[in-house]
Amino acid sequence: MKGKVYLVGAGPGDYKLLTLKGLECIKKADVIVYDRLANKNYLKEAKENCEFIYVGKASSNHTLPQDDINRVIADKAKEGKIVTRLKGGDPYVFGRGGEEGELLKEEGIEFEVVPGITSAIGGLCYAGIPITHRDYASSFHVITGHLRDDDKENPEINWNALANTNGTLVFLMGVANLQKISSNLIKEGKSKDTPVALISWATRSNQRVITSTLENVYETAVRENVKPPTLIAVGDVVELRDKLNFFESKPLFGKNVIVTRSRTQSSSLVSKISDLGGNPIEVPTIKIEKIENNIALE
């Protein structure tokens, strides 16, 4: 039996932002290879004997190099298994899904790609920031925040073009290089007063949004101790946040709620807590069993 690989975008974090097809791929997987930003609650949807392999990457702390991740995925598929590669966001938006797909093609392994909601769009939405708006931005640009460690210019990033566009700029994985990003944009002509939003843990109950200006954003981030994962949104659309911020106004936003019901009974309550902006934590303390041979109850 030949194996198959599904490269699945897990969305930006909110449990309910996974696609139906993505959920199907999780449920039928023999092996799930998942990263740091994929919501771990999705693993509860897997079948009982599913194998879980964590390959998460944090800043300067990678569980496995990308080549080794590619090898794990391919080898498991060659064993005849259905492999679901679960990635935060979308596999093809700085998710290195293209590299994984190339290897699978080269080795004759069947694969499919299941798109996911990228945090560049979904994350801004949950922060009350539309990535485009008729009166503010008619385009958007998603840019990697990983810059070179030396002082040389990144040949793949045209700072002059970015600084002189009226579109929204979204930098992913850029907190460590925030000072370089802001200074490069200002150097190439972007107004120092351009609004900027820093969105940490976007779409989750612990989402945190800090706004500033291009000139002051680095100092603001240092003062507020902003850490990855954080999106950097640059543009006038940030000004709409106060009007369009629906998520953080939910009654349970920012609260952890422990659910002690048995797992078979907790799903509806967990869903309601999530809908109200809370973070449900399932800690079953109740187990329902059939009563047998209890004379006291006869």
Predicted regions: what is each one?
Residues 1-15, 20-117, 121-122, 223, ...:
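Class I S-adenosyl-L-methionine
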Residues 2-7, 78-83, 139, 144-263, ...:
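A contiguous loop/helix-start segment that scaffolds small-molecule binding in enzyme catalytic cores
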Residues 14, 88-165, 210:
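Class I SAM-dependent methyltransferase SAM-binding "motif I" and its flanking Rossmann-like core
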Residues 24, 31-39, 258-272:
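N-terminal basic/disordered segments at the start of proteins
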Residues 40-41, 59-61, 118-122, 139-142, ...:
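Short gly/pro/ser/thr-enriched loop/turn and capping motifs at secondary-structure boundaries
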Residues 50-57, 108-112, 131-138, 189-198, ...:
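Short hydrophobic/aromatic-enriched beta-strand-loop microsegments
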Residues 259-298:
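A cross-family signal for N-terminal binding/gating loops and helix N-caps
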